């Protein structure tokens, strides 16, 4: 499945909002890990890497940020805001910039955490030279 960005349905009722993510419909892999980013200083950046094996689905639960994606044709910029979801397959360069002060995103991962970061390419020049063409 290629990179995808889409809005989730937001249900508003009696003073709150509910946003469901149906795993069977929105996540094309078995979820092995969930993590989230909160309390970022306004303007913070995170990510800026690709994975060799890991696939991820990101959900912007609150706030906004800029998603920087390279799916094989150079960097693209996407606004990522409350209620948006994004599927990032392996070998797609990704990161988030300009997080708002209230930004919170949740990530659903196909792999368990590995502290040695052997599944990462964090050098964009190396990514462009060696890995960009491997996108499924």
What are the language-model segments listed below?
Residues 1-82, 86, 102, 108-136:
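Non-catalytic, conserved peripheral segments adjacent to functional cores
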Residues 84-86, 90-95:
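Histidine-centered metal-chelating micro-motifs
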């Amino acid at each position: 499945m290629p990179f995808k960005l889409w809005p989730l349905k937001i249900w508003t009722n009696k003073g709150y909002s509910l946003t469901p993510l149906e795993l069977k419909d929105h996540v094309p892999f078995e979820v092995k890990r969930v993590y989230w980013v909160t309390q970022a200083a306004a303007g913070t950046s995170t990510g800026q890497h690709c994975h060799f094996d890991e696939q991820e689905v990101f959900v912007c639960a609150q706030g906004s940020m800029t998603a920087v994606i390279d799916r094989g044709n150079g960097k693209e910029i996407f606004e990522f805001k409350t209620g948006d979801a994004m599927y990032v397959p392996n070998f797609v360069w990704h990161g988030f910039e300009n997080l708002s002060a209230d930004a919170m995103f949740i990530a659903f991962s196909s792999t368990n955490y590995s502290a040695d970061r052997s599944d990462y390419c964090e050098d964009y020049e190396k990514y462009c030279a060696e890995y960009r063409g491997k996108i499924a």
